[in-house]
Amino acid sequence: MRLTALTVSGFKNLKDVSLHPDTHYNVIVGENAQGKTNLLEAIWILSGCRSFRGTRERDYLCFADSGPMQIQAAFDDGRRVQTITCTMQPSAGKEKRFLLNGIPVTSTGSLFDLFHCVAFTPEDLALINEGPEVRRNFVDLCYSQLTPRAVGAVRRYQMILQQRNAVLKQALPAAAAQAYLDVWDRQLAKTGAYLTVQRSRYLQQLAAVCTELYGAISAQQEAVTLRYQANVFGRDPDFSDCTEEQLAAQYYEKLVRAREEDRALGFTTCGVHRDEMQILINGVSAREFGSQGQKKSLALTLRLAHAQIYARKWKQTPLILLDDVMGELD
């Protein structure tokens, strides 16, 4: 994946930027608060994803200008050059609109499938320091770039989970509650089993590549280990002898057994939304015992490992965006 041209206007503090990047490596230098990270963020937004900085969309518009925002990039995926445009009008509800080769895009999922980026920022320390949800989201985003249908499965799971939790919060008669829950449990089990398999397969690949990359970074002095703690199926589950139908049946049975507790608590206590990816250095928790430099090296390793896995899968390297990559590395 090569970025061949980029124009940005009216995005945060970037009033009028036009670039024709080198096809291999580009280094952006400048004083603090000049817009270096904003430039990377603008490129990332064209993938159809939310800002990697958590920026609210209404804050995309230029600080010192009341005009519209436009981000446009031409990219070469090895087959042809295409153009993605993102616009936002101050007077149109501050909603993003995308064009692909001049044609309106109705689903940002199509951009996610076309324009692949891997971004590393200092905020990626959250992959190590924060709770399990951050790591689950990271893994889901990564395998979704390898298996496009998984994007819909992740969204579907969240929708079904919300519906199940809504039933759990209602003061329904026992028979009615069981009937409603059975409908949602069967759907949740099917989708949850699929996502568990996707996470397991991806994490096996990620663990192998991370071991290699982190070994090189640490001059073979430290070893990194990734463990998948699947809430329904246990640590590092082996699904080689199971079909998804069999896994869905096991998942469903666990949901059924948890119904009474879930009704008492008002939420779903088991499922892939409670999975964890544990990261260890030399056998101990990186989150609890790692230095700041080790944690940043690990976060960078996770991002670069995914880029390598992506390249193997699709026979092309994604666009890699690195922000302040050298600070605080051991």
Label the predicted regions.
Residues 1-31, 172-321, 327-328:
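Conserved NTPase motor "head" modules and their coupling/switch loops across ABC/AAA+ ATPases, GTPases
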Residues 110-117, 121-190, 315:
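A conserved P-loop NTPase coupling/switch region
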Residues 25, 43, 122-124, 283:
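ABC ATPase nucleotide-binding domain signature
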Residues 48-134, 140-150, 209-212, 247, ...:
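Nucleotide-state sensing region of NTPase/ATPase domains
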Residues 45-56, 305-314:
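Post-Walker A helix-loop "phosphate-sensing" segment adjacent to the P-loop in P-loop NTPases
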Residues 108, 328-330:
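Conserved ATPase-coupling elements of RecA-like P-loop NTPase cores
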Residues 36:
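Conserved lysine of the Walker
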